[in-house]
Amino acid sequence: MRDSSQNTLLNILILYIVFERLFYKFAGPIRYKNIFCVPVQETKLPIAVANYLVYQSLMSLTREWQKYSGLNLAPLRQFGTVEYRHMQGHRDIKYLLTWINLLFRLHKYAKKHEFILLFNNIQTLNTTSAYEEFVKSVFKEDAHHLLTNTLQPDMESGVST
């Protein structure tokens, strides 16, 4: 993340919030209620993101960020990295590689798009209901790992946040 632009970081944040429930479902339901992996949508962090959009202070955003949220931005200050806390200890290599590929695809998509265009596209999702198409555009051939029968309500909550 050290070499990433603020545009990329913002894109990662909004994409993460949109897909957060899908990530938790992939990682396993036990993680959703874990106090060391609190969903961003269940905190006041989306307000911090909105404030960042207004005031453009990355330092204040990372300072306000909660360490035990599912996506932890606090390491940005010291290490130039972000931390995804969803994945519990696991021995299934294929499962872990799938998780890594999902995150890689999210980051790759975030780097390719301008924030304002992505933001506008996300804002229309609850109107167009193009959730599955959006998942497929971001995660490509790995999208099937996130497509569930509750895709619409899971993504609606992220889009509305």
Residue ranges of model-derived segments:
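C-terminal accessory/tail domains of diverse enzymes
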Residues: 3-161
